[in-house]
A protein has these predicted regions:
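Short coil-to-beta strand junction motifs in C2/discoidin
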Residues: 86-94
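Acidic Ser/Thr/Pro-rich low-complexity disordered segments
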Residues: 101-126
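C-terminal interaction-tip segments
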Residues: 2-19, 161-191
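Short amphipathic, basic-aromatic surface patches that mediate peripheral association
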Residues: 56-61, 75-86
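N-terminal leader/pro-regions and domain N-caps
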Residues: 1-49
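Extended, solvent-exposed segments with strong compositional bias
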Residues: 27-38, 118-149
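Noncatalytic modules at the cell exterior or secretory-pathway interfaces
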Residues: 69-78, 149-170
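Predominantly extracellular/luminal cell-surface or secreted proteins
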Residues: 93-105, 161
């Protein structure tokens, strides 16, 4: 009896960073990179993110690979850079605002605006929880697998709740970036 194997492959990543000011095509320190291939850029400037505050990204372009079909499961990675050393055990908590609309102010969950801006709506319970990056006592904290998220809509935005004990670096935020990598099943022909 022959059987097929189901492997996985990566689709095009989403790359959340301050593309407008500080972040070039890759982190300033190559060892901090979570980037695979050529990602789709999404603007998210955390230079004003204080401790115990929240921030949201701009809304993504369509997540569709072809037509209106899109990958369901995505792996989330984060590289954070504090203005000082965060409290060990502190967290950066990540949420997803799933939206059926490409328009920034339309169809958002939890009071999100769809704009790169502070998030003060207090609607985290209405967002999809992705996971938490638990800090160690380093200025830069990295995890390539903060969590996975199943995306129910073609559009959305990222929300960060900073509980690290420190503000984010406010200048030269050239290492701060987040990736969402689609995991796509790849059925292999029977051997």
């Amino acid at each position: 009896m022959t059987t097929n194997s189901v492997l996985q492959k990566y689709g095009t990543q989403l790359l959340f960073a301050d593309h407008a000011t500080d972040f070039a095509a890759a982190p300033d320190t190559p060892a901090h990179s979570l980037i695979i291939g050529t990602p789709t850029d999404v603007e998210m400037d955390l230079s004003e993110l204080a401790n115990a505050a929240m921030w949201q990204s701009a809304k993504t372009a369509t997540l569709a690979d072809t037509g209106t079909a899109w990958p369901i499961e995505w792996v989330f990675g984060a590289c954070m850079e504090g203005a000082a050393t965060p409290t060990a055990g502190g967290t950066y908590d990540f949420y997803w605002n799933a939206s059926p609309s490409a328009t920034a102010g339309t169809g958002n969950s939890g009071g999100c605006s769809g704009l790169n801006a502070t998030y003060t709506a207090g609607g985290l319970d209405q967002l999809l929880f992705i996971g938490s990056l638990v800090c160690v006592a380093n200025v830069i904290n990295i995890s390539s697998n903060v969590g996975t998220v199943v995306l129910p809509h073609l559009y959305g935005s990222l929300v960060i709740d900073n509980n690290s004990g420190v503000a984010m670096v406010d200048t030269d935020a050239d290492n701060i970036h987040f990736t969402m990598t689609p995991i796509i099943p790849d059925v292999q022909a029977a051997a």
